[in-house]
């Protein structure tokens, strides 16, 4: 190496350059990405280690004894009929009187799975994104869908813009009542709706087996409306009474399964209230509302009304009828009828409820019906039984309409 005097600038010769380039020093291993970002088992934080095993001398946790069955009350009033005995004599007993259901084992927390939120694809930039939230109101059997906004939608019109709206569809189900839509916003690719659409009559069973399809479309006055993009949310991903917010990328149209059995297609649902009034000495039947009714008219709607009978009807005087609601598949009635009858005789009776489509100049069309009483099963039997066991208490339940009722008169 060349020696330098004090005050001189350090210089490096070509030979020294060669030595530095050829012999850079000891070779060290190149660090990998995993050295900077260590891997951990899914779901564990970096500082989490294996759980410590319980010490062998730790006392065992005592098992919780199951609660014994409640015996029926021995001090019933003499003037009240023994409803359980009557059900045993005239029909099937639904089992123990309604009480707190046995505690279910705690559900395992779902794994953290990536929602549509940070998802990115080619469709994300081509079709746009959609922000919305879903809430299942378990007490009122309602699914609230709030459509907030969309961003970066695909241009559909000649001016480079679109006239977007959002359409909801519950799958499976082909009924027009299963479809809801927002208003249309004109000439925008970044619409803000802040609009809430609600499905009524949604049960816990629906939340397990149904999927909500959300489509963004472009409205065209002179041609068919055009599809922009969609997303689908299995309702089982929602927790009851908990709002879940989504920000997703729209996808191309997915095929709808049309192989589902048409015989299982629902005719609609009806919300009925029952109450035995001690003051009026009679059964109060409330027809509250219907939801998702089958369309019977050419315009895709129905003109529904409801009839009720208390069977057997020897005198043929038990018929009651609501008002007709025009051009709707989700009518609200809020009407109540009273049947004067002794409490003890109700266990021998059945309540027949039928929904009809009103037509001018021709016979009315049967939409669907339901029978509550001693010969019913499931929720229909339980609703009737709960009414008889709880005098002066209004009990409200949703019931699925069927296309056939055993022994019922299906002509108006």
Swiss-Prot record:
GO molecular function annotation: calcium ion binding; calcium-dependent phospholipid binding; syntaxin binding
UniProt topology in membrane: Peripheral membrane protein
Sites of Phosphoserine modification: 411
Biased composition (Pro residues): 95-108
Binding residues annotated for Ca(2+) 1, in chain numbering: 157, 163, 218, 220
Disordered: annotated segments: 38-123
InterPro entries the UniProt entry points to: C2_dom, C2_domain_sf, Doc2, Rabphilin/DOC2/Noc2, Rabphilin_Doc2_C2A, Synaptotagmin
One BP annotation, GO: positive regulation of calcium ion-dependent exocytosis
Composition bias type Acidic residues, residue spans: 112-123
Residues engaged in binding Ca(2+) 3: 297, 357, 359, 365
Glycoprotein keyword on record: no
Tree of life domain: Eukaryota
Matches recorded under SMART domains: C2
Stretch list, region Negatively regulates targeting to plasma membrane: 1-36
Cofactor: Ca(2+)
Mediates interaction with STXBP3: annotated span: 257-375
PANTHER family: DOUBLE C2-LIKE DOMAIN-CONTAINING PROTEIN BETA, RABPHILIN, ISOFORM A
Free-text domain note: C2 domain 1 is involved in binding calcium and phospholipids. C2 domain 2 may also play a role in the calcium-dependent targeting to membranes.
Name the record gives this protein: Double C2-like domain-containing protein beta
Upper lineage: Eukaryota, Metazoa, Chordata, Craniata, Vertebrata
Primary gene name: DOC2B
């Amino acid at each position: 190496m060349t020696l330098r005097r004090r005050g001189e600038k350090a210089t490096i010769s070509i030979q020294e350059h060669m030595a530095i380039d050829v012999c850079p020093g000891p070779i060290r291993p190149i660090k990998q990405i995993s050295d900077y970002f260590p891997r951990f088992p899914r779901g564990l934080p970096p500082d989490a280690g294996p759980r410590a095993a319980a010490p062998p001398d730790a006392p065992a946790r005592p098992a919780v004894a199951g609660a014994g069955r409640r015996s029926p009350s021995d001090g019933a009033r003499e003037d009240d009929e023994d409803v359980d005995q009557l059900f045993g004599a005239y029909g099937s007993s639904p089992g123990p009187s309604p009480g707190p259901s046995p505690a279910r084992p705690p559900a395992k927390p779902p794994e953290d799975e990536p929602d549509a939120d940070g998802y990115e694809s080619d469709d994300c930039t081509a079709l746009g994104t959609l922000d919305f939230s879903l809430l299942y109101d378990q007490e009122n059997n309602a699914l609230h869908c709030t459509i907030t906004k969309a961003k970066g939608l695909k241009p559909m019109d000649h001016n480079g813009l679109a006239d977007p709206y959002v359409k909801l569809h519950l799958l499976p189900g082909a009924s027009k009542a299963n479809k809801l839509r927002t208003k249309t916003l004109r000439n925008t690719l970044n619409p803000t709706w802040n609009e809430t659409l609600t499905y009524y009559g949604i049960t816990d069973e629906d939340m397990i087996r149904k999927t909500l399809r959300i489509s963004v479309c472009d409205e065209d006055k002179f041609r068919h409306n055009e599809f922009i993009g969609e997303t689908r949310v299995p309702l089982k991903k929602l927790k009851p009474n908990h709002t879940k917010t989504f920000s997703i990328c729209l996808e191309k149209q997915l095929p709808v399964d049309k192989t589902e059995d048409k015989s299982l297609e629902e005719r609609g649902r009806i919300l009925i209230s029952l109450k035995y009034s001690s003051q009026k000495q009679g059964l109060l039947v409330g027809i509250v509302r219907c939801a998702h009714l089958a369309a019977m008219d050419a315009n895709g709607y129905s003109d529904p009304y409801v009839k009720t009978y208390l069977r057997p009807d020897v005198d043929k005087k038990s018929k009651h009828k609501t008002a007709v609601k025009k051009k709707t598949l989700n009518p609200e009635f809020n009407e109540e009828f009273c049947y004067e009858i002794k409490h003890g005789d109700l266990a021998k009776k059945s309540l027949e409820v039928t929904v009809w489509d009103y037509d001018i100049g021709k016979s009315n069309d049967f939409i669907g019906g339901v029978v509550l009483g001693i010969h019913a099963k499931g929720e229909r039997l339980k609703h009737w039984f709960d009414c008889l066991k709880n005098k002066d208490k209004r009990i409200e339940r949703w019931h699925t309409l069927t296309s056939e009722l055993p022994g019922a008169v299906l002509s108006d």
